[in-house]
Amino acid sequence: MTDLRELFSPTRLPGLSAHGRALLRHLREHPQAPRFRDFSGHRLGLAERWQARARHAWWQRRAAPDWLAGEPLPAWVGPFVARCAHGVDAHAGKAALPFAQLPTMDRHALATQLAAHVPRSLPLDELICFSTSGTTGHPLRVPSHPRVACDYYAHHRRALALFGIVPKAGVGDVGIVLAGFQQRCFTYVSVNPLQRECGLAKINLHPGEWRHPGDRAAYLDAMAPELISGDPVSLAELLRLGLRHRPRALLSTSMALSAGLRAELEAAFACPVLNLYSLNEVGPVAVEVPTLGGFVPLQPRLLIEVVDDAGRSLPPGERGEIVVTGGFNPWLPLLRYRTGDHASIVRTPQGLMLQGLEGRAPVRFRGADGRWHNNIEVTRAMAPFALVRFALHQRADASLVLRVDAHEPLPALAARLRAALAATFGDTPIEIAALRADDKVRQYTSALAGAETAR
């Protein structure tokens, strides 16, 4: 039996209406509902909701910065740097430096000196710290706040608008389902106070979290969410469920989404699939628009650079590490923060765009003829396949191991995968194996000397 005091907690859900209460009970107590393990809520009072609406309206009217290296900085950057220099211990003394000479910061600095990066003047009574995985970098706790969680909504709306979608869910509707697929994850129901208390559910599609195997499809069909968000692992699981419901859009975050899987999802659900480039430290950075050939930046107050190993901004079209300044989280102002991801940045008639986006440090792989190949060549070779995830490793003897997570049987897929890699690497020995890790894995690794260049 649901603990209604917890479900309707005025601390978590201030101002909850009668129709909001009814929707929460429907989400949680439906006969096919999963085992919800937690309680959560927006924690926004009336004044904070109006402030959020004002912020969101301002963002909707502003474009992302149209700035490239060597051009005059946007007007807001100078004051932002000054506030960081005077109010954030980690940035003390930086106000007098030209922007191009500001040192870069990285995930290691946040992992080891997090308190020094939180502004001294901000209240800490409602501070939230989210833990992030360390499988692709240093384990990290990200300081946040209920208003920050609310502001993700505004930037997702900006992304949806690029595909002609304006969310319509309202009273009695389920606006979004956040779908995971893990042995165990945080699951709850809530409402969106900025969209007439439409419903939100964070669910785990792992079969062990449901009473019966068929309940997953039955529950999603009954809730009929306007949007479904997940990562390629959980979205691929949706393909196996036989859903009748068709959301207006799917949002993919957290991991790289292959072009093949996106095409299969779009065909199955007859809706766009948004491939979001998003980080826990920054929030949604950009969204891929395939017709434009790259990722379109989303945040009006996030300056994006592409830099070399020494932290120097690179000219348009040159490939380097993505560095960001600004963001919408006041509790974690970022000043030339190295994301660990790589791309080039160009100006198009539609504005700035990130092209060739790849996560984490580049890795080179050696072919049978001794030539080196960038990992982006591997990404392109794998793009036609509807893979949930893949990871490529080169052993010390130069042989390759490709591990894949796919809903197509591996024996039927292996020959085509091997042929796709052989087109780049020649007759290098290639082993194909299943990828069964429950969490994120590093996509590209090598035991060969010279495969990776340290910063």
What annotation goes with each model-predicted range?
Residues M1-S131, H138-A169, L227-S229, A249, ...:
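Nucleotide 5′-phosphate-binding alpha/beta core
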Residues C84, T132-T135, G175, I228, ...:
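Conserved S/T- and glycine-rich ATP-binding loop of Class I adenylate-forming
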Residues C150, A154, I176-V233:
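AMP-binding/adenylate-forming
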Residues Q195, H245-P247, T291-F295:
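Short, hinge-like loop/turn segments at secondary-structure boundaries
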Residues P225-R262, N275-E281:
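Adenylate-forming
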Residues I228, F328-F425:
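AMP-binding/adenylate-forming catalytic core of the ANL superfamily
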Residues L261-R347, A361-V363:
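Conserved AMP-binding/adenylate-forming
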